[in-house]
């Protein structure tokens, strides 16, 4: 009965057979032990392969991309992909790239200068980790880039990786903080360091060097701004196809205000993407207009900015007392 049921519902994928239990049943040739494929090769990815990959990713909505390559050409392609997807395709994203092992600080700064992008970060230190055989091996910086991209993907938008711990078993080499790290930060390199309490990100920045705007330099601030754009766009999307009249104009303003209000809620009540208070609102100056078949929305908002520096001033005073 079981055999008939399997055959009737298998749709050609299963062919069950009832075997006489009194007959000897031998194992199939490929089940007597583990058999591994042999021959063949992984091959080497060329530029055209990477372009095919980035073209395929135009159909996928992701927020972070980390190409597993040390090639500056691939890094440039990744940045171009992120710029296009963010500005044209309305699927904002960012990339983190890494150089090869033994990259000097000077070479890393030169590579960051060549990119100079607000949507691309660059790391130049590899890390030690155990391979599948239990041997401690050095992973190249572009693997570190993938690790950091995964970390960014696992936190709320607006959360910086600055001072966050990295789960590795050592860094390729040590940096002096602030002698080496400040120079790297000023050069647009996302630096990692070894501290007394573990391995940490010094400052999660992009390779942007044109100015010091937070939404351009800080990955977390730019990510927060991207999330604001996505949220407001999603809130307004149901209005596409509706009548261009005063009622729709009013509803658009309500939808924008509501979406921004949610984004301004601090954690754990909301995402905490926007920062503000009663005297300094998280968003303001909402302007909605209709011109022909175009509904235009403009507003000002304050994406949350990470604390990167904590100066401490100590005033020493002599002790005096009377009795």
Predicted regions and their residues:
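A glycine- and small-residue-enriched flexible loop/hinge signal that marks low-structured segments
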Residues: 1-243, 264, 271-277
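Short, hydrophobic/π-rich interface segment
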Residues: 248-277
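C-terminal edge-of-domain segments
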Residues: 284-323
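Residue-level marker of positions within ordered structural domains that often coincide
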Residues: 70, 261, 304
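Long, charged, glycine-rich C-terminal linkers/tails
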Residues: 267-294
């Amino acid at each position: 009965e079981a055999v008939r049921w399997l055959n009737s519902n298998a749709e050609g994928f299963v062919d069950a057979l009832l075997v006489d239990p009194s007959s000897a049943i031998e194992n199939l040739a490929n089940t007597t032990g583990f058999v591994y494929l042999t021959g063949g090769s992984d091959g080497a990815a060329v530029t055209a392969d990477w372009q095919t990959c980035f073209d395929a990713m135009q159909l996928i909505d992701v927020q972070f991309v980390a190409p597993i390559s040390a090639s500056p050409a691939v890094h440039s392609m990744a940045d171009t992909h992120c710029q296009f997807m963010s500005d044209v395709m309305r699927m904002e994203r960012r990339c983190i790239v890494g150089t090869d092992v033994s990259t000097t600080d000077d070479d890393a700064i030169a590579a960051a200068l060549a990119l100079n992008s607000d949507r691309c970060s660059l790391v130049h230190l590899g890390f030690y980790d155990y391979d599948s055989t239990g041997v401690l091996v050095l992973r190249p910086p572009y693997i570190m880039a993938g690790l950091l991209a995964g970390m960014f993907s696992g936190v709320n938008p607006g959360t910086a990786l600055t001072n966050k711990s990295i789960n590795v078993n050592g860094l390729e080499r040590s940096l002096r903080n602030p002698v080496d790290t400040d120079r790297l930060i000023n050069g647009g390199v996302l630096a990692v360091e070894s501290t007394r309490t573990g391995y940490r990100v010094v400052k999660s920045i992009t390779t942007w060097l044109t100015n010091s705007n937070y939404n351009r330099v800080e990955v977390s601030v730019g990510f927060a701004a991207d999330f604001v754009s996505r949220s407001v766009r999603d809130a307004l999307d149901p209005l596409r196809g509706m009548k261009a009249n005063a009622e729709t104009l009013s509803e658009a303003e309500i939808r924008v205000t509501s979406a921004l209000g949610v984004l301004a809620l601090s954690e754990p009540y909301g995402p905490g993407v926007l920062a503000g208070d009663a005297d300094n609102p998280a968003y303001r100056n909402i302007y909605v207009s209709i011109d022909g078949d175009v509904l235009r929305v403009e507003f000002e908002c304050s994406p949350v900015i990470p604390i990167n520096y904590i100066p401490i001033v100590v005033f020493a005073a002599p002790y005096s007392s009377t009795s």
